[in-house]
Amino acid sequence: MANDVYASLGKDRKRFLNWQWRVIAVTMIGYAVFYFVRKNMSVAMPGITAEYGVTNKSFGWIIFAGSLVYGFSRFINGYLVDRVKGRIVMAAGLLLCALSNFLFGYGANLSALFTGVNEGPDFVNMFIMLMGVTIILNQYFQGFGYPPCARILPHWIHPSQLATKMSVWNCSHSIGAALAVVACGYIMGTMGTDMSQADGVVNTIIKNLTANGVDQAQAVEQAATYAAHIGAWKW
């Protein structure tokens, strides 16, 4: 007990440590969910390219803008969390991220509503714009996640143990990202509408893939798979 940094708590030591690990676990779960609703969009991108012909260049610009917004958001929300309860900011961020994901899934429907068509350049350009807005909004709301954790955890962890226990907490990044890849990969491979027997759909997918740099032979091979799960990315 000589090296026990919590010995001064006396009879409250055990209770404090129980709550310490609860706080670590809850914030880990919360931040893992942030990553889950962040990385899922990346899994949807290949399906969107196949169905609508959105290029890697367009995705690249959207991701670039979103990354800048994410960094700005962490800075701004760090200031906010010093003045507002961290758990409120974190809960609000998760809710807003979920809403932006919901809007992302309806991007094609909204594009058709605004343009009056469900294909062609006007539809695709509107879809790219709406998708970009929802992804960038998601990235901004992602910035609500880390600042509350950075404020809350040092209150519960002694400085001599902070690096070790924060290393455990940092596993939340990997957990959230891994769950997103597994869950969304399953959805992309099992959900959606089977249009693999529709020659027009298959030919459109082949055209979209080859226009995005995929080899013709590979595009033909992949087209049937994508056509069998049309709209799976919306989930």
Question: What name fits each language-model region?
Answer:
Residues 169-235:
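Helix-loop-helix hairpin linking two adjacent transmembrane segments in secondary transporters
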Residues 39, 67-75, 177-178:
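Residue-level signature of mid-helix packing/kink "hotspots" within the transmembrane helices
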Residues 95-124:
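C-terminal ends and interior cores of transmembrane alpha-helices
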Residues 1-36:
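Cytosolic juxtamembrane N-terminal segment immediately preceding the first transmembrane helix
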Residues 22-56:
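Extracytoplasmic
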Residues 134-171:
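Cytoplasmic helix-loop-helix junction between adjacent transmembrane helices
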Residues 73-85:
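Helix-to-loop junctions at the C-terminal end of transmembrane segments
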